Design a protein with these regions (language model features):
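Extracellular glycoside hydrolase catalytic/binding regions
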Residues: 10-26
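Terminal leader/tail segments of proteins
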Residues: 284, 314-351
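Short beta-strands within extracellular/lumenal beta-sheet-rich domains
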Residues: 144-153, 266-276
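Short strand-edge motifs at loop-to-beta-strand transitions and within beta-strands
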Residues: 152, 191-195, 271-273, 310-314
Length: 351
């Protein structure tokens, strides 16, 4: 029979283990049977494919799936690999394998932003607005991943004491006339929230909702619609007549964004960088000082970042780079931009 020792995918970085200890455990298992090493090579959850777990609250996975595996995220042989190989060799013949891949790493240093564009200014080049009496989830528009923006104008002036979003997931940022007013995440989206807003007639209400990753097991799989699939209630009154922009942020749409000279922006925004590469190598993009969002290199979605950690740097394999100027676009949603990024030759996790 096959014995299997594994761990859940959540809290990956809390499950790092000593190579010698892991090798001893592997040896004990092989004394009695077979083993399935999960993960042997974790790799990277590029794009919006990180997924999530649910333990009475949403726990999205980060972009890196390194998992403290025998092979690192960027394909490096680790001490754990060597220790495992030595153990397995005591139980079964292992052929000699010559590793020919030369993994070149590069630290391109700091880079300054050369242009910015507010999401609200880019909506109509990123997507075509849908008109709907009620809010609808992104799946109802054929959208699988990314963000979705809901907009309505208040028909009358209101003194608002509570707001409630029903059937909403995963993270909603609420703006009044372009100014951030409230952010609700996961369980905060259940029930009404006290506010104190004096809203004039015609005030513009925007709600940007992010799909942080779908749960891929258990009964929760049937509850994975993202966006708002119910109603937006102000003091119990449902708002109607919405304009809805689906924002999967695919490469073709990103190319249409027009950037302006850098200026302070408290709204969700796109920041452009030009990286000149003379010699390609694997590199790690550090986003210290930034808030939350995702990054695109030459139109390819490198994944998500969030200043809550633990991941501090995004892995960029050398084949994603091109000789000469590379276009890097950071989409940041919190209004926290450092205006610089830095490329290192090593990853960094802060546990």
């Amino acid at each position: 029979s096959t014995l299997m020792r594994s761990s859940a995918a959540s809290d990956v970085y809390k499950r790092q283990t000593d190579a010698a200890q892991s090798a001893a455990e592997l040896d004990a298992i092989l004394e009695r049977g077979s083993v399935n090493i999960y993960m042997f090579h974790g790799g990277t959850n590029f794009c919006f494919m990180n997924g999530a777990n649910d333990y009475d609250k949403l726990t999205p996975d980060v972009t890196s799936y390194d998992y403290d595996s025998p092979l690192s995220e960027d394909g490096q042989i680790t001490p754990k690999y060597e220790a495992f190989r030595n153990v397995i060799a005591r139980h079964a013949p292992i052929p000699e394998v010559s590793f020919r891949t030369d993994i070149r790493q590069a630290a391109y240093g700091a880079l300054c932003c050369d242009g910015v564009c507010s999401l609200f200014d880019a909506l109509d080049v990123l997507s075509t607005a849908h008109s709907s009496r009620e809010p609808r989830s992104m799946e109802r528009f054929g959208q699988g991943y990314g963000y979705i923006l809901y907009r309505t104008m208040l028909p009358t002036a209101m003194e608002v004491s509570s707001i409630e979003l029903t059937k909403a997931a995963d993270r909603a940022q609420i703006f009044i006339d372009g100014v951030p007013a409230l952010t609700l995440y996961d369980r905060e989206l259940s029930g009404a929230h006290a506010v104190k807003w004096s809203l004039p007639q015609g005030a513009q209400l925007d709600i940007l909702v992010e799909n942080l990753g779908r749960v891929n097991y258990s009964q929760k799989m049937m509850q994975q619609r993202k966006g708002i699939d119910g109603a937006v209630l102000l003091d119990g009154q449902a708002l109607q007549n919405w304009q809805i922009w689906t924002l999967p942020l695919e490469s073709g749409a990103l190319k249409q964004i027009g950037f302006s000279p850098l200026s302070a922006c408290r709204q969700p925004a796109f920041y452009h960088f030009a990286l000149d590469v003379q010699q390609k190598g694997d590199t790690f993009l550090d986003l210290s000082g930034w808030g939350k969002g995702c990054v695109f290199l030459n139109g390819f979605n490198l994944g998500r970042f969030w200043n809550v950690g633990p991941q501090q740097r995004l892995y960029i394999p050398a084949p994603l780079l091109k000789d000469g100027v590379n276009d890097l676009v950071v989409f940041e949603t919190e209004g926290f931009s450092a205006n610089t990024v830095c490329f290192h030759d090593k990853p960094e996790l802060r546990l």
